[in-house]
């Protein structure tokens, strides 16, 4: 849980603090996040891993990303003068659709430079999270699973239930198509494929295919993601400087 801080100080402020290293380690342990300040700008790194936990608590044995932690943190990052850009490191197995889409919508709505890097996996609701950043990268060995909306537990076997599923699914398709280079029909083709997975409907795509189909912007690793983010930060700073000169 995020700590309450005095004034406008953010929980990730580490510069000039006597206990800065201890606070930084605590942020990495509790939130899987880190704040770094260098000559190319200040970057906040946030990991989104495991299962996206929504309104229902996941079992203690499952690694999760809690939406009630991430959402206020994203708002603070957007508002803070200390942070120039956001780097998202993704390795997800899916999770709560509403919670995942809520996080993805927040990221997509940020004005600050954002870059996502898919590592290991970006499965299910991890796909909208991956494309929510302004630039997305994927390592060659990472995989992304695209499948229809599913619900665990008992459901009512009525037409209205399947209509509800279809409406949620359309929201995901619309979001992914709007925030990436893949078309709706192509994404639906991957989602509804029946010959790709032995026990499920859908498709598993890897790094190169994710880029070639337009889902992810480019192949790359950590240094590539940081380089992309630094370029975006520099471009934004130049635009703001030019705007301030014109106003004055």
Task: Tell me the role of every PLM-derived stretch.
Residues 1-127, 132-147, 151-248:
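N-terminal organellar transit peptides
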